[in-house]
Amino acid sequence: MRSFYNKCFTNKLISAHSLFCQHVSTLKNNKKECFEDVKRSNRISDEFYSSFLYHSYIENLKSTKEYVYFIYLQDIYYNINIFKNKGRLYISNNGLCNDKLKDNNNNNNINSNNFGNSYNAYTKKKSFYHSFNDLNEAKEIRKKRKNEKSEKNIVEYLLCNIINPNENYHIQNIYNHNLNNNVSIEIHKKNDSVMYHYNNEKKTKTSKMTTDIKLKQINNVYIKYVPYKNKIITLACPNKYYPTLYRYFSSHTNKKEDAEENDKNKNININNVDNRYKEDFMYGCENKNDSEKHKKTTNNNFGDEFEKLKVKELDKILNKLEMLYDNKNNKMNINVKILGYIFKNFLLKNKELKRKIFCSLFFLLCSKMAIIYTPILLSTFIENVNLQKSLSNNIDIYSTNKSSVLLLCAYVFSRVLSSTMNELRNSVFSNISQKISTFVSKLFFYKIHNLNLTYILSKKNGELSFIFNRGCKSITNLLNVMVFQIIPIIIEFILYLYILTYKIHYTVSLVTCFNMFLYVLFTTLITKRRTIIRKHMNKAEQNTFNIFLDSIQNVEQVKYYTNEIHELKKFIKEQKKYEKEAINVQKSLSFLNFGQQIILNTNLFLCMYLTYLNIANDIFPFSYLILVNTLLFQLAMPLNMFGTIYRETKLSLVDIESMIKILVKKIKSPDYGNQMLIKNGNIKFENVYFKYPLNEDINGLEQNYQAKEKDPNIINNINNINNINNINNINNINSINNIYTFESNVKNISSTNMITSSINKLKKWYLDKVKDNKKNVQYNNNDVKKTNPNITKNLNKEIKENINTHLKNHKIINNSPNYNNNNYLFQNFTCNIENGEKVAIIGKSGSGKSSLIKLLLKFYEVNSGNIYIDNKNIDDIDLYTLRKNISVVPQDTILFNNTISYNIKYGNFQCTDKQMIQASIKAELHDKIMKMENKYDTIVGERGTKLSIGEKQRICIARCFLKDSKIIVLDEHASNLDNENKKAIEKALTKLCMGKTTFIITHVMENLKHMDKIIFFCGKNIYVGSHKNLMDDNHFYREYYDSKNNKML
């Protein structure tokens, strides 16, 4: 039974429960009994229930309006009718069949009126089901009975003598006589209509059954026959690649499996669960009628999703970015190069976007050409009107007015055309910029989830989200600035210069060029200063945001200790810093705008003056003043924004640089397409050495040291030692300040205690040197005499040696750690854990218990040694497979601010709703959920704050049931629970850990006697053994065990 159930539903052919719920809501309780109630009362098994629903799904033929099914369970026959158009489902007892069975078996316990014979009108009373295991079985029957003419079973006769599975048939009519073998069947082979008739000696009146079923070769076969002796043949291959042939459905199931199923389903009341999420959450299908998605298996679903998201393409792009970043020889700015590669890679694979870019540039050019002609048309119009006025007596007024009106219309049309082209450009390019931003967002989000856990945890709250938000916005802003502002300004400027040279005079163009150069130079210099001020403002803003976020996230702690005033003071302090920096930004903006206006108006004055001189000499007409004035004002409009453009571009590049630094970090991407399974769960730790990794900046410094490319700050500070006031005044405070400067620079490299202590020692050593040489230094109030050059040389040499020694202390030579270092948590740790063993991990807090599990999950990398799972080194197992086969129940479960059903399904989104509910029952959670107002649709709140600790732990356990991993980790799972919740959770965990390798991190001693192995962390030593062996042979464990028990007592 279980194998059939798994075959039907883990392959995602259909969710039986969801399909049933599409029909069950229309049943009338006073006439019909709910099919689920029949199932729950142990009169129907999962196998038949699944078969019924699966058939009703795959036989969804357009020409069929009604489906009739028969089920024989627990000595009772049932008939099921589904009316497709009306969406109704009827279930009734087959009274005639039950009476016949009662007479044959003399079973007085069978009640043929369980559901009322009055509903037999809705059913086809004499239909039975049976199936061969495969078509080969039918062929064997055909061989055996090929020459027999008197068949007792018409179905076997047809299979053996008439129906060829490799040809197409269409069964149109079946005439049923009674429970015996009196059957008439019409079979249409291709275009030939043949009537095959089989009669027993006893002839009765026939009745027509409404059956219309197709046979489609061997890849897609549906057959429905009327057999004898309570059976019918049903062969079905619903999927071309994964044929499923239904088995013979026995009326008796294994008692042990029945008992287990009864325990699972004892309290399910599906009618109380909202049907909406059953349909919407199933396999991520948006359309419940999307049969193709329902027919895919779990692995195929995931594989299609994997291909759809193009994860391999993302990995390829990220690897290329890492290579570009490592190539330091290229003279081009690395950030610009990486950004260019991302744009190029994205645009080359999107032909539609190429067309949109071309259209956008075309609209841009048309817009600028139109806006350039507006001042020319206006000037011509004024000149024409002026000419008309002066010569009104000598020319035809009508023709002159006509030309003026045409010029005026052309002027208005050019302005409208320019505006229209601008809007078309905006609408087309907005699609491009948003798609690129979405692409980069997907790339960054994928990268974040594959970064080293230590790096992510080292960041402040909200820092990564801040970088992500600003980086994505900056990409959109940069593209908009480039296309909507920088490129248009360049095009406009070139066109304006051409018109000024061609229409006016080259001197006007030269004056304009010179003033524009001054304008750009002034704007650039001021904006650089403003960028620094703006960075200070952004930093103050981010600090304010971090304080606000941290305070809100810890609001309970604030209220516990009544520190609301303290939090308010801290927030106001940072807010004032932000206020000060924001005022400075506004002041610098005002100064920038003032200087820009001075330059632009000076240029306007000079150009207008030169034009006036030419007009006064009768070289140009009067209208040229308007032409020059309009041209320069149109040029000034985008130039007024140049400072903002420059600043936004610089800030965008800064924000993008922060994002790029994360994108180019080297990672080992999990192979999401790999479906390899860990079968047993045997684990072996072999000579493992591990210590917590240094800060990543120090690691980078070590790499630079190995490559002999030391940090320039260090080199500058070392070289500056030669110039500590030219070593003329060792006592001078500037000398000591240089050491403090060196300390601050190194602290910028790392904030670790190791570095800080080393710098303090260096500072102390230096001051001691100062005191030792103080006696040798002679000075007065005006001059400072030079010290001995040997002292200078020795001092310089010793400082360099101290720095080099400090760096070498952190260096790993030939990838082999310094095993004498006392910072190692594990030294030569070895342990073998067999499949299904229960292993307790105990020891003092901070001794490395959780770190051992993080090594197993590859959150950290071992410094030396190997870890094996099923005799495979975890370095050779991709991260996806590794972590997919390990389930963790942490001490504090974090939930997403979503529904309970979403949080449970987070363990396996490919599960069905029925599997989710069964997991909730196993986790002792279902009853609590059903008491809630919205049941499985209840929102859990931020990080699950609306639920108790026990409820959150049970959700996590339900996730683990759905994940169904071979290795379970319980990390102090019951440390914060009361006794009642502990008992319920222990009961659920007993089911979860049955037959699986289990690690239990705990401080509770009462269960240690039942553990197969105990890993005991004692200082730098780790002891492994059973409870009895450790109690007998290890006095440290004995003392620890006794001390914990005494505390409990």
From Swiss-Prot:
Its EC number is 7.-.-.-. It is a multi-pass membrane protein. This is ABC transporter ATM1. Belongs to the ABC transporter superfamily. ABCB family. Heavy Metal importer (TC 3.A.1.210) subfamily. Keywords: 4Fe-4S, ATP-binding, Iron, Iron-sulfur, Membrane, Metal-binding, Mitochondrion, Nucleotide-binding, Transit peptide, Translocase, Transmembrane, Transmembrane helix. ATP binds at residues 843-850. It comes from Plasmodium falciparum (isolate 3D7). Transports glutathione-coordinated [4Fe-4S] iron-sulfur clusters in an ATP-dependent manner. Required for optimal parasite growth during erythrocytic stages. The keyword Transit peptide applies. The keyword Cytoplasm does not apply. GO terms for cellular component: membrane; mitochondrial membrane. GO terms for biological process: transmembrane transport. Homodimer. Interacts with ISCU. Interacts with IscA2. Interacts with NBP35. Interacts with mHCF101. InterPro entries: AAA+_ATPase, ABC1_TM_dom, ABC1_TM_sf, ABC_transporter-like_ATP-bd, P-loop_NTPase, Type_1_exporter. CDD domains: ABC_6TM_ATM1_ABCB7 (cd18582). ATPase activity is stimulated by reduced glutathione. Disruption phenotype: Conditional knockdown results in parasite growth delay during erythrocytic stages. Accumulation of organellar iron. No significant effects on parasitemia. No significant effects on mitochondrial morphology. The chain crosses the membrane at residues 357-377, 397-419, 481-501, 506-526, 591-611, 619-639. GO terms for molecular function: ABC-type transporter activity; ATP binding; ATP hydrolysis activity; ATPase-coupled transmembrane transporter activity. It is found in: Mitochondrion membrane. Residues 807-1043 form the ABC transporter domain. PANTHER family: ATP-BINDING CASSETTE SUB-FAMILY B (PTHR24221), MITOCHONDRIAL POTASSIUM CHANNEL ATP-BINDING SUBUNIT (PTHR24221:SF503). Residues 1-90 form a transit peptide. Residues 360-651 form the ABC transmembrane type-1 domain.
